[in-house]
Amino acid sequence: MNHAQTEGINLIFLERSGELRTEADLAQLPQHLSDPRSLIWCDITGIEGGQQGPYGQLLRKVFGFDELTIEDCFTTNHLPKVDIYDDYLFVVFFSFHLSEKRQRVETVEVDMYVGKNYVVCIHSRGLRELDRVRRRLLSHDEFVSASPANVAHTVFDAVVDEYLPIMNRLSAIVDGIEDELLAAGDASDAILDSLFHLKHELSALGRLAVPSRDIVGILMRPTVRLIPEDSQMYYDDVRDHLVRVIDMIDTMRDYLSGSLDIYTTQQTQRINRSMQRLTAIATIFLPLTFITGIYGMNFSYIPESNWRYGFFAVLALSTFLAVGMIVYLWRKKMI
């Protein structure tokens, strides 16, 4: 095995002898590519320079990859996908990372080529998942070193293994939002903003996880010759992990939608109770307004205006009507 650390490019050559040659460099790539019994790991960090930069030229001139796949490597905003060529596979998938400070999931696109004797990964920044793959290769891991299909599986497995802890952390955040939302009664704008943001985030993660599951399913088909049958059982384990991740995403989205529905129902009930009280108050004062309205008209002659006890009689009548309305509304359970 030969290992070289070139600026932005990590190379590992597994040779027939199994030796580790530290002096290996990019100049040795064509020689190893022409040897079907070699195994090459090429990990490229950074997409600076674009398609015409040094990394793009490496993919084009040394590996001979299709121009459309090279374009995909140096542009963003893709969905996971797999393109099957005669002598290699091109796979796009995503690494998830949770920002504890911002409580948001950041995604990093990983583009991977899988050939008969090589695996090439391209990503915009360093990923600890791929560092673990590199360490396993350098430790002469028997499974990983067996074939490019096993290396590709190890990459998938390392990336997907990071999904579950993130889903568990998001689940705890969802539970916290749900508890705050239902306990607070009147939710603050911050809680509602967190809820809507998390729903949007889960939808985005679902749009990445579902096609990733489908990709693994495609790679397990017998027609994909670069993934031998003895490696497919390991890919099935990755697919099971992705199915679990998708189920967790759907469950969390349902919890958030249910919490929002309950909160909306509570708010509606609260408004209805307020309207009921206002209606009761208006009903109580309606006869009083009627009476005072009549006696407030500017006429020279108003009944009982010259009666000594007229004011007290009207006051007593108003009180009687008000008490009567209160008793009536109370019996009707409106107040």
Region roles according to the model:
Residues 240-335:
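Hydrophobic alpha-helical transmembrane segments and their immediately adjacent juxtamembrane loops
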Residues 1-251, 304, 334-335:
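Peripheral, non-transmembrane regulatory/ligand-interaction domains of membrane transport proteins
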